[in-house]
């Protein structure tokens, strides 16, 4: 059996050291990070898994899977222009 340091083993295989520690995504919770436990529960039910919503919620919380929030869109600082001008109608008379 040959023992080598992690850096040397990665150099021999011509791989970056960071690829060794990276894990592939596993399961629907990792693949669909914008889904919360409710939507994930529906997906599991559609696939035929008889699973309770509370169990999915507990596992989701224990694995610290949170919904990735979308970044807020930066505005240019100007108010949007009105596409339809307001004018009084004759119905108000």
Swiss-Prot record:
Key words of the record: Transposable element
Name of the protein this chain belongs to: Insertion element ISR1 uncharacterized 11 kDa protein A1
InterPro entries: HTH-like_dom (IPR025948)
Record lineage: Bacteria, Pseudomonadati, Pseudomonadota, Alphaproteobacteria, Hyphomicrobiales
Pfam families: HTH_21
Region (Disordered): 14-33, 68-93
């Amino acid at each position: 059996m040959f023992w080598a340091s992690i850096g040397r083993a990665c150099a021999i295989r011509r791989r970056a050291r960071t690829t060794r520690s990276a894990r592939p995504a596993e399961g629907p919770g990792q693949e669909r990070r914008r889904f919360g436990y409710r939507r994930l529960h529906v997906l599991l039910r559609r696939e035929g898994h008889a699973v309770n919503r509370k169990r999915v919620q507990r596992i989701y919380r224990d694995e610290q899977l949170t919904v990735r929030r979308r970044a807020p869109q930066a505005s240019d600082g100007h108010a949007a222009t009105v596409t339809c001008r307001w004018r009084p109608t004759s119905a108000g008379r």
